[in-house]
Amino acid sequence: MAINNNKIVIVGAGLAGLFTALKLAPLKVILITSKNLGSGTSSQRAQAGIAAAVGKFDSVSSHLNDTVQVGGGIVDQKIAELVIKNGPDRVNDLISLGVPFDVDENQELILRKEAA
C-alpha cells in the first residue's frame, strides 16, 4: 500500500486549529473536530483570552519566566521561548484577520492578567 504524505490534518476547531488552516492557505487541509467550528473549544472557554507579551511593560523574558514558573515542571523552555517570541506577530495576524479583541477608546488592546 502506498502512503500519501501530502495530506495536512488539523485536529481541533479552536483558535489555534483554525488559524493554522488559514496560514496554510491555499493548501487544502483536513480539519477534524467534534463540534461545529469554534464551539466547544478551549478558545471559547478561555473567552478569547490569549497570553502574549504585547503590553508596554511586558517582555519575552518576563513572560517566559512566568510560563516556566507556573508550568509544573513540564515546560519545554526552548519551545516556550519560540512561541512567546512569535506571540506579538501572531496577535497582529489575528487582528488583521478581523478577530474582535477588546480595545479601549484609543483602539489599544485591553490587557488582563491570565490565571496562573
Feature map (PLM): residue ranges:
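A short, basic/flexible loop-to-alpha-helix module at the beginning of a structural domain
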Residues: 1-5
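N-terminal Rossmann-like FAD-binding beta1-loop-alpha1 element of flavoenzymes
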Residues: 6-31
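Conserved N-terminal/central alpha/beta ligand/cofactor-binding core
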Residues: 34-116
